[in-house]
């Protein structure tokens, strides 16, 4: 029975040793020898065991792009073999190792479309989520991929909550949501600098409402104090400052918010 790798290797920690460990875990009972090494992956009719083993060996030696192509050949040449199912998921993993994340996603999705109830479905969903996660860029760029990573990680957690994949997905979700909140904060600050206070208020409120467990919430509340005062809403500013103080006492953003309200709306502070 095939045992797929539990934790796909990350982009910044990929190694030949781990690749070899992954490959060795995929040895199948009755597997034939590796045979000769083809110069490329052009179509050459080969028996399924030889072809699969060649793909596995290429992966173990760190040649993930060729391994992926060879695993694809297993399915193409032997579509009705039990090896084809194994090769589909190993193709997805090989593309992931090769940092060809779009193909990794496509291969894993193909596996799930054909084998939705397979025992390795949790791994396929997890691999899709990681392939999106690895493509997350800095907050200055479009966050479409980040949203896709968030959706995919949530799907892993929803479908397989008791698995180790879900445990890791939850950890990554925290990072993803912090990233998305950071983007909202960047846009909100831009609107503030442009004097578009209502637009800024909407962004900061979104952080407070939808990303309240992230590290950006204290600043978002402070920015809501700022924008409320700029809009001539001192009572709203006081409300946000109070929420900030109740949830983050001693935080530098609360100290700044308190001072700001004291300077801009001293009568409200005196009345409190």
Task: List the predicted regions and their residue ranges.
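Acidic, polar-rich low-complexity tracts and alpha-helical solenoid repeat scaffolds
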Residues: 2-14, 22, 27-272
């Amino acid at each position: 029975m095939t045992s797929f790798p539990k934790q796909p290797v990350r982009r910044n920690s990929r190694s030949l040793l781990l690749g070899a460990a992954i490959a060795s875990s995929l040895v199948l009972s009755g597997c034939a020898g590796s045979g000769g090494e083809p110069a490329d992956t052009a179509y050459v009719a080969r028996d399924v065991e030889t072809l699969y083993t060649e793909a596995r060996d290429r992966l173990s030696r760190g040649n993930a792009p060729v391994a992926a192509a060879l695993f694809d050949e297993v399915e193409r040449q032997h579509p009705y073999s039990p090896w084809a199912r194994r090769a589909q998921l190993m193709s997805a993993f090989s593309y992931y190792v090769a940092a060809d994340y779009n193909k990794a996603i496509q291969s894993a999705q193909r596996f799930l479309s054909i084998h939705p109830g397979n025992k390795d479905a949790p791994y396929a969903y997890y691999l899709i989520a990681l392939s999106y996660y690895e493509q997350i860029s800095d907050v200055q760029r479009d966050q479409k991929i980040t949203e896709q990573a968030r959706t995919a990680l949530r799907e892993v957690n929803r479908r397989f909550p008791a698995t180790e994949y879900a445990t890791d997905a939850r950890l990554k979700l925290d990072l993803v949501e912090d990233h998305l909140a950071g983007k909202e904060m960047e846009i909100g600050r831009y609107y503030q600098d442009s004097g578009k206070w209502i637009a800024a208020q909407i962004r900061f409120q979104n952080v407070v409402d939808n990303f309240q467990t992230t590290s950006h919430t204290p600043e978002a509340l402070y920015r809501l104090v700022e924008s409320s005062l700029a809009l001539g809403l001192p009572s709203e500013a006081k409300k946000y400052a109070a929420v900030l103080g109740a949830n983050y006492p001693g935080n530098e953003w609360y100290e700044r918010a308190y001072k700001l309200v004291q300077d801009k709306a001293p009568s409200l502070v005196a009345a409190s």
